[in-house]
Amino acid sequence: MGNYHPHGNASIYNTLVRMAQPWSLRYPLVNGQGNFGSPGNNPPAAMRYCCTGDALVRLPFGHSVRIGNFVPAACPNSDNAVNLKVLDRHGDPVVADQLFHSGEHQTYTVRTAEGYEVTGTSNHPLLCLVDVGGVPTLLWKLIEEIRPDDHVVLQRTPPVEFGPADWHDVMEALLLGAFISEGFVSEVRAGFNNCDRDYFAMVVGAYDAVVGGRRYVSSRRIASGSTLHELDIQNIKELKEARLGDLCGQRPADKSVPDWLWHSPAAVKRVFLQALFEGGGSCSALPRNMIQISYSTRSRQLAVDVQQMLLEFGIITRRYRHAVGEHKVLITNRAQAELFATRVGFGGAKQEKLTKILGSMPPCAGMDSDHVPGLARFIRKHCGSRWVDKDWLNRHNVDRIQRWRTSGEKILSHIADPDVRAIATDLTDGRFYYAKVASVTEAGVQPVYSLRVDTDEHAFLTNGFVSHNTEAR
């Protein structure tokens, strides 16, 4: 409608809202969807523009699509009918029936302390954990209302089903992970090397099955005493014709996860991550029974993509830039390392090393940064329990997600108030990670998009953040 008004959408939004309110008009003129306020003067939802086109929307079976690619030919300020299933705030599939291209607007990037990011307009709502009178509560906040040290909600429920995986796609994912981490593809030549003989043989076999053509393999002893196995491809004609051809001439700092892999099911993404970490990742035991799993790259975008893909498997990581210029994706606590080992893992000998490190560590006591902010204080104040139970609650960490996984029933046995029990159970069931906001910065004027989701909660996932859909464009 803004195309027909000299001052755009904003000038007519309030009128459109009133036209959809049955208490404002005897005969409503607009069939509204979403929050249009109430007769008690509760305000309607703000007009929303949503996220930039690079935001990844999660679909069932581990598929992901950038919101700007749902309807590639969508015109600015247009409504586009779609019929697809996306994941809601709980990780369940729901129907999205409209894609809105809302034109170009000023945008802002919300970045968490771990490095997770989403970019949207100032009036786009994200689900946050807010202290409401001492009660930790899940509420929507507009990006313009979010401040550093607030806590945003990240959805981390892993796919229940990994979806059908075509063998050809699996082999291509394996090759992509291997060549991104320890290979190169120039305009005239390509190569790959690794010290793990079995892993190297697997990569060569995948290359023969997917790409084919003449190639050479060799082995040599290097300074460390290990044997380095090398794959040399001197004619890359066949490689250019495959989807790996996108790597031709790509600088290390420009590497990223291609769209075809984002569109693939979780089973294919898992193989890619296994190959990537086997080539460029590492794991090591640290003092004081700590562990570290890391992946290093010169490409910022690749680090962002790897962190985001691990989040799709429910694995929380930290991303930062090292002093030497490399971007690192890091796991530093036992609970997340165990999830990595079971849900993704390395693709070769490093997996055995990781298993041994985890096996040598004492049982995880749940003391890590994965917690529900404000929950311990709320439970201790409002538990309604006897003094002996209150004393137990004061002496134990009752806000850690891992502790609730291992000792949830024991914690609940010390809480008498049923409402407190219900709130604590809902916040600690593991669906969400409560990430502290590090910054909210301007990101310039960009095209923005939104979906209309046919549920009561009107929520979908963008880069793991829980976003509210648009009521009106």
Swiss-Prot record:
Q: Which residues form the DOD-type homing endonuclease domain?
A: 175-315
- Name the enzyme's class: isomerase
Which biological process terms from the Gene Ontology are attached to this UniProt entry? DNA topological change; intein-mediated protein splicing; intron homing
Record GO terms (molecular function): ATP binding; DNA binding; DNA negative supercoiling activity; endonuclease activity
Q: So where's the catalytic machinery, residue-wise?
A: 49 (o-(5'-phospho-dna)-tyrosine intermediate)
Q: What is its main location?
A: cytoplasm
Which keywords appear in this protein's UniProt record, sorted alphabetically? ATP-binding, Autocatalytic cleavage, Cytoplasm, DNA-binding, Endonuclease, Hydrolase, Intron homing, Isomerase, Nuclease, Nucleotide-binding, Protein splicing, Topoisomerase
- EC code: 5.6.2.2
Question: Can you summarize the PTM annotation of this record?
Answer: This protein undergoes a protein self splicing that involves a post-translational excision of the intervening region (intein) followed by peptide ligation.
Any keyword Oxidoreductase?
A: no
What are the subcellular locations of this protein?
Cytoplasm
Report if keyword Transferase is assigned: no
This molecule's function is given as:
A type II topoisomerase that negatively supercoils closed circular double-stranded (ds) DNA in an ATP-dependent manner to modulate DNA topology and maintain chromosomes in an underwound state. Negative supercoiling favors strand separation, and DNA replication, transcription, recombination and repair, all of which involve strand separation. Also able to catalyze the interconversion of other topological isomers of dsDNA rings, including catenanes and knotted rings. Type II topoisomerases break and join 2 DNA strands simultaneously in an ATP-dependent manner.
Q: Which family does it belong to?
A: Belongs to the type II topoisomerase GyrA/ParC subunit family.
Any remaining note in the record? Few gyrases are as efficient as E.coli at forming negative supercoils. Not all organisms have 2 type II topoisomerases; in organisms with a single type II topoisomerase this enzyme also has to decatenate newly replicated chromosomes.
This chain's protein is named DNA gyrase subunit A
